[in-house]
């Protein structure tokens, strides 16, 4: 399979995930601020999940941009990632509809954790296919974000059963560290061209 088809399939699945999430947002019953305020947990859950899907899409784009080959293992690892991301609409809706209750918040964290582990597997297979001395391997470096995020998700899962606000803070913090643009791959590829 060519890289273009690989990217197009992934982009399509991610677009569908976002579409499903937005369709879960319900129109408030009533025309008052009080009616709208009842929807805030669902809306906040949607915003956080939208950010996560956007982060994965952006990083997926950069990772594949640095890839010259697509292997069968990479295809399966990518499907694994897309599977966990496809659970975001369910876990997002469940958490929001239940106002960040402990179990839905923990299950949301499990989906985040499994997506992070799936990302690590995909990234590892892509680096292996490119070679340990590749531009991609050098660009990724120690990957502190990739190591810190699962720890924050684990902390959030545990915190869900004690103080759900701490769980949400852990999930938000993980998203925020990824929102800071990471131009390592772009810089490494630009440097390689010169």
Describe the residue ranges of each PLM region.
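Multi-pass alpha-helical transmembrane bundle typical of ion/small-solute transporters
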Residues: 1-194
């Amino acid at each position: 399979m060519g890289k273009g088809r690989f990217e197009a399939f992934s982009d399509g699945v991610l677009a569908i995930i976002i579409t499903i999430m937005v369709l879960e947002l319900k129109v408030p019953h009533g025309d008052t601020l009080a009616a709208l305020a009842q929807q805030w947990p669902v809306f906040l859950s949607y915003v956080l999940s939208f950010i996560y899907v956007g982060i994965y899409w952006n990083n997926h784009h950069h990772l594949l941009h640095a890839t010259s080959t697509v292997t069968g293992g990479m295809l399966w690892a990518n499907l694994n990632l897309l599977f966990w991301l496809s659970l975001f609409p369910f876990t997002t809706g469940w958490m929001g509809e239940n106002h960040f209750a402990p179990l839905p918040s923990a299950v949301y964290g499990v989906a985040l954790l499994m997506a992070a582990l799936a990302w690590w597997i995909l990234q590892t297979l892509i680096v292996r296919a490119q070679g340990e001395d590749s531009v991609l391997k050098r660009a990724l470096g120690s990957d502190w974000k990739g190591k810190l995020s699962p720890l924050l998700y684990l902390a959030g899962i545990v915190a869900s059963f004690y103080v759900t606000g701490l769980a949400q803070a852990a999930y938000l913090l993980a998203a925020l560290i990824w929102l800071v643009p990471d131009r390592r791959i772009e810089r490494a590829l630009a440097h390689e061209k010169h």
